[in-house]
Structure formats: structure tokens, C-alpha cells
């Protein structure tokens, strides 16, 4: 695998380098200085782990240092705005979730506009879920709804104006219940449940790997069963119309040279085929792949429309 990856990476980088040289001698040596990848969340989750693998591959392929900077805050708005306002030269790259280019703009939370970013590509689909402790008195959305109508259920989420949070609130509305309390967290993991900070949490499987034997999945926010909990029902099966898929990709400021984006894409595509990236996919059930800029743009457009529908559903 290692030898194949080295050959594939060399081929992809060579192709991108030829493209750079054809466009501009000044860009042919990109990167000529360190590249910063901004992750607008704390360290540890899937986007952080995979971005670090990509940064390492860039360093190996180009000889230039590449680093990951975590800038959490505002449901990813703070770090994302740092990308949007950076120079369009390829030296600041955002590793951004679906909400950054959809829900935050729809809700008016973002200081940047819809055309602030250009997609390099998408490389991750999250194994996202609504999770509870194993001894919780409910195992699916119907049982949760029945319990919450008379009992207390505290929800932990990553932010009010994020797609999974909005989907959870829409699901509760359609099922006729309200959470007794809810709060946003920068990080949601085993300790959140163990400490009683929340009774159910919206999170990814990567953050609860250390307590898989102590939790249950109430609903999977995916289009396919979770590999770690294959019997868990999809949210869309339990609440028709809520077809939720959450992804992450690389974005650069508008106006970044195409040749630079091509080189970033080549490095990322090769990195997703490495053993390290595939090990993460196997361990967590994450979708690890490469979707090019054109296909990513179509996916983003659909996600924007779907996010608008979530907002409308909550206002009814």
C-alpha cells in the first residue's frame, strides 16, 4: 500500500505541477512557503484527523511545511471567516463543514457572503448520530419522543444554526415533543454523557470510540447504516423527509488560482488513499474519498436548498 501510494502521489503531483508551470512560472513552485490549514473546531474529530494527514502528505510531497491550526468558535464561523478574509493565494486553506457554506449564511450568522469561498473538493462524510447512554430509557426517536413528553431530556449539540442541530429540532417538532433543555458545546464525547452534561448528543462516532460499549445510537444522520452500529435506524427512516448527510471539504478564498487549487486537490486525493486515512474510515465508519470541485459545487447547491427547507420547517 505504501509503495502504491507513493507512486500515485508522485503521479498526481507531477500532473498538477505541469499545470502550474503551464499557467505561470511564479506559481510553478507552489508552495514556496508554509501552508496553513484552518480547522474551525477543536482537535480530535474526523475533519481534524484527516486534515492532519493531508498536511503531512503536502509536506512530504512539496518539501514545504504544512500545519493545521484549530480555530473553534461561533459554530465554525470564526475560523471560517479567517479563511474567507485571507489572501487568495493557496497559503490559507479551510477544512470546512457543510454548515459553513449553507446554514450560517441562510441564518445571517456569517460575516462572509455565499461567494466568499471556492471549493477545492470534498473528502469526508461524517458517521453522525444522535447518541445516548446505553441505559437510557429509549432506543429510537419514537421512544425518545414518548419519554420526553413526560420526562426530562437534555440535548447537547455543536450549535443552534448547524444542520444536525436544526434537523434534531425539526424531528422533535414533527414527533410532538420538546427537549427540556439544550446547549451548544465545542466538543461532545463520552464525558458529556458520563458527566450528565447532556442526556443525548449530536456527534460523530469518532468522538465516542472510547465508550462504544456504553452508548446507543438513537438515530443515524447518514444515508447508509453506521458500520459501528449497523442496527441503528436512520433519522430519515424514523422521520420521513429528514435525509441528512454531513460532509467536510477544502475551501479557499474566491480568486485563488486554478493551478493552485489543482495542486491542493491532487495532494488531497492521494492522501485519502493512504493507509492512515483508510484506517480512520475503517475504525469510525466515516466516508473517506475525494469529490472534485465541479461535483462538490453541485452537492453544495443541493445542501443549500435542503438547509433552507430545514429553516422553513422550524418556522411553520
Residue ranges and their predicted role:
Residues 42-44, 98, 133-138, 157-162, ...:
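Short coil/turn segments
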Residues 113-123, 179-182, 199, 206, ...:
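Short beta-strand->loop
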Residues 1-4:
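Positively charged n-region of N-terminal signal peptides that target proteins for export
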Residues 82-91, 105-188, 235, 245-280:
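Hinge/capping helix and adjacent helix->loop/strand transition within the periplasmic-binding protein
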Residues 32-34, 174-177, 259-316:
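An extracytoplasmic/periplasmic, membrane-proximal ligand-sensing/linker region
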Amino acid at each position: 500500500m505504501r509503495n502504491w501510494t507513493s507512486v500515485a502521489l508522485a503521479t498526481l503531483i507531477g500532473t498538477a505541477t505541469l499545470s502550474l508551470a503551464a499557467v505561470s512560472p511564479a506559481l510553478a513552485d507552489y508552495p514556496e512557503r508554509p501552508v496553513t490549514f484552518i480547522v474551525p473546531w477543536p482537535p480530535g474529530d474526523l475533519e481534524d484527523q484527516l486534515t492532519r494527514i493531508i498536511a503531512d502528505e503536502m509536506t512530504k510531497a512539496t518539501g514545504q511545511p504544512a500545519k493545521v491550526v484549530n480555530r473553534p468558535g461561533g459554530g465554525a464561523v470564526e475560523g471560517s471567516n479567517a479563511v474567507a478574509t485571507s489572501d487568495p493565494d493557496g497559503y490559507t486553506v479551510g477544512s470546512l463543514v457543510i454548515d459553513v457554506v449553507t446554514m450560517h449564511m441562510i441564518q445571517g450568522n456569517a460575516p462572509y457572503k455565499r461567494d466568499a469561498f471556492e471549493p477545492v473538493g470534498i473528502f469526508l462524510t461524517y458517521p453522525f448520530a444522535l447518541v445516548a447512554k446505553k441505559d437510557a430509557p429509549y432506543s429510537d426517536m419514537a421512544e425518545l419522543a414518548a419519554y420526553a413528553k413526560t420526562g426530562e431530556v437534555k440535548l447537547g449539540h455543536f450549535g443552534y444554526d448547524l444542520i444536525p442541530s436544526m434537523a434534531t429540532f425539526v424531528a422533535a417538532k414533527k414527533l410532538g415533543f420538546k427537549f427540556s433543555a439544550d446547549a451548544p458545546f465545542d466538543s461532545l464525547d463520552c464525558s458529556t454523557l458520563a458527566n450528565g452534561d447532556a442526556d443525548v448528543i449530536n456527534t460523530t462516532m469518532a468522538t465516542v470510540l472510547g465508550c462504544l460499549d456504553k452508548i446507543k445510537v438513537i438515530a443515524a444522520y447518514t444515508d447508509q447504516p453506521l458500520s459501528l452500529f449497523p442496527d441503528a435506524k436512520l433519522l430519515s427512516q424514523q422521520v420521513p423527509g429528514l435525509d441528512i448527510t454531513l460532509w467536510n471539504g477544502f475551501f479557499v478564498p474566491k480568486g485563488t488560482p486554478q493551478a493552485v487549487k489543482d495542486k491542493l486537490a491532487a495532494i488531497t486525493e492521494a492522501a485519502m488513499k493512504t493507509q492512515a486515512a483508510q484506517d480512520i474510515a475503517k475504525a469510525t465508519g466515516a466516508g473517506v474519498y475525494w469529490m472534485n470541485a465541479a461535483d462538490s459545487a453541485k452537492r453544495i447547491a443541493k445542501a443549500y436548498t435542503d438547509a433552507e427547507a430545514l429553516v422553513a420547517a422550524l418556522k411553520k
